Amino acid sequence: MIITMTPTQSKMARVALKWTTDDLATKAGVGRMTVARFERGDSVAAETVEKLRKALLNAGADFTRRAGRVGVTVPE
């Protein structure tokens, strides 16, 4: 099963990790505007979302989705 990440989860995780859009873009190997577009809810390629998700997972983020709710946890 593939777990996807919503734009809201991306921004929640990025902010909780104290990362800028530049930080996430660099760690994911994508452009800063790509991060901004995704977090705004604009369409980006599935491969790009996966790069963003993996960068956040590598930093310890955990994404949850249950009963119509999404969430994120990060290490303290």
Task: Give the ranges of each region predicted by the language model.
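Short, intrinsically disordered or compositionally biased N-terminal tails of bacterial proteins
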Residues: 1-4
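Short basic helix-loop element that most often maps to the first helix and adjoining turn
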Residues: 9-23
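Conserved hydrophobic/aromatic packing and binding residues within compact polymer-binding modules
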Residues: 10, 24-25, 35-38
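DNA major-groove recognition helix of helix-turn-helix/homeodomain DNA-binding modules
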Residues: 46-64
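Short glycine/serine/threonine/alanine-rich loop segments
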Residues: 19, 30, 61
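Short C-terminal boundary/hinge segments that cap the last helix of small helical domains
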Residues: 58-76
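Alpha-helical residues within the helix-turn-helix
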Residues: 15, 26, 40
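Recognition helix of helix-turn-helix/homeodomain-like DNA-binding domains
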Residues: 29-44
